[in-house]
Amino acid sequence: MASVTSVPKTGRSVNQDVPATTLTLQTRPTPAPNFDEGEHLIRVHATALCAGELYWHTYVTFTKEETVPGPDVAGTVVLAPPSSPFKPGDDVYCRIPYSRAGGARDHTIALTSELARKPKNLTWEEAATVPLSALTAWQALFDQSGLWEGPEDERVKGKRVAVTAASGAVGMWILQFARIAGFDAVIGTCGDGNEDFVKSMGATDAVNYKTTSLTAWAAEKQGRKADLVIDCFGGKSLADAWGCVKDGGVLISMVGYPEQEKPAGLEVKDVKSHFFIMEPRGDQLQKVTELVEQGKCSFLMDSVYPLEQFQEATDKVESRRVRGKVVLKVL
């Protein structure tokens, strides 16, 4: 284990002045891990920002004194509990819950249950784009859909899945996982110019929502409706998703509550619908690592900024005019 004396007493940290959304770069004490709680001290190499995270304090009770953005972290273990499978010097990545300080600082804290080994074929910045998006996609498809509870040979055989905002950071991961899982058809909605990208990620059909709604597309030909529809955008997109789900199908959203967006007068039978929030799962992220290292999945990175340019990076994320993740290079 690395010596405690090798850990600097202070470090750079981008802190949010809650309840405001103001961010400042400060010099703060290096966090001390509690080994009894499975905490590891991580030297952060890169962190990815998330749109809307500066407003999460209105929904989440923070368990730490500091509010630091950057839920996606890629870094090196500095200190670890004696029983941890992750040792000092290990290259790891993870998703940190919004209730704790994130990765926009020199050192941060991560739990054993959150960590996975960083893919060897990704740079630090590339690895930081993966955890939040990939885990959200994984849990939507494999945990929340209910399709994996039956006999193995019947789970996806002949099944169709539709994904809204399929060219986005989460949607593109769902497409890849659905392709690997063997769905009979994978439908993805996207805007102008993204059709080829969506198909390259695994979609059998790309629907340009600016010219054709998902509801209209599904109604054009018999058999186009999906057994599973996953919404990654909310609002009108979620309302439109109702028109594409089969009777007896499943509609999931990670953005809003499907029943609140259900169009008035729409007749659907026995559709199971729900909203979910992903949970940090190192065991699932490790499976993603294996897929990435095998060349079966790819990432999507928009841009990289040094930590000192945190405000420019944040402004870009909040503009929503990005394609992929915006990353802060910390080390």
From Swiss-Prot:
Primary site of residence: mitochondrion
GO cellular component, one term: mitochondrion
Region Disordered, residue ranges: 1-34
Species lineage: Eukaryota, Fungi, Dikarya, Ascomycota, Pezizomycotina
Subcellular location field: Mitochondrion
Designated name of the protein: Probable zinc-binding oxidoreductase, mitochondrial
Pfam families the record matches: ADH_N, ADH_zinc_N_2
Organism: Arthroderma benhamiae (strain ATCC MYA-4681 / CBS 112371) (Trichophyton mentagrophytes)
Entries under InterPro entries matching the protein: ADH-like_N, GroES-like_sf, NAD(P)-bd_dom_sf, PKS_ER, YIM1/Zinc_Alcohol_DH_Fams
